[in-house]
Amino acid sequence: MTGVQTCALPIYVSIDSIAGPSEIVIVADATGNPQYIAADMLAQAEHSPGSAILLTSSAAVADRVAEALESRLAVLERGDLTRDSLERFGAIVVTRSDDESARLADELATEHLSIDTADPEATLVRIRHAGAVFLGPYSPVAAGDYAAGPSHVLPTGGTARFAAGLSANEFLRGGSVIRLARADLAALAADITTLADTEGLTAHRRSVEARLDG
């Protein structure tokens, strides 16, 4: 019932989004730092549930990240919950190339995208869909959550394909005011009547003609 009530809410009042669970996708090449990558995966997984996915073209990096996850889990305060989250929603994927890693990351349209490659800016140009992007080894998601400045309310579940993070714009309401002179309307008339006829809305067309035929 809670989910139904939440979905019905926008009928009466707009909300920012229905966000969660938390997500991270990490794109790394052979230069990626396994300790940093593991730390960021755990930082998302400890939300429990939270998904954490590594896409790397380097099998060696993948192996070292798996080892780092185990050693870090052993001393993590929420270790059991985090391990359960990783087992259910985590993955280490070895891709065939850096291009494939970027393509998969873009398809996932994740909430948080971390790029730990030799040239993160070059990787970034292949990405169109992500809630927030963290470039290079010294840009952990936690910095974005708490101090670096971007919104902490970000699109999840693939909605970064069409949505952005919460901003001040969510609290603003815009409108449109149109005033045309007769010559302006005449210049638009052909387009208006074509579209109106296509939709079968003849009264729309005639509302324009009434002003121009007299």
Task: Give the location of each predicted region.
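Short acidic-hydrophobic sequence patches enriched in Asp/Glu that either
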Residues: M1, S57, V61, A163
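Short, small-residue-biased leader/transition segments that mark boundaries at the very start
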Residues: T2-L9
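Solvent-exposed alpha-helices and their adjacent loops that cap or buttress functional pockets
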Residues: A8, I15-G20, P34-Y36, Q44-S48, ...
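A conserved active-site cap/scaffold subdomain adjacent to cofactor or substrate pockets
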Residues: S14-R88, I92
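Phosphate- and divalent-cation-binding pockets in alpha/beta enzyme and binding domains
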Residues: R64-V65, R103, A122-T123
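Glycine-rich, Lys/Arg-enriched anion-binding loops that position phosphate/diphosphate groups
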Residues: L73-S114, A118-D119
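C-terminal core of ALDH-fold dehydrogenases
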Residues: D98, D106-G214
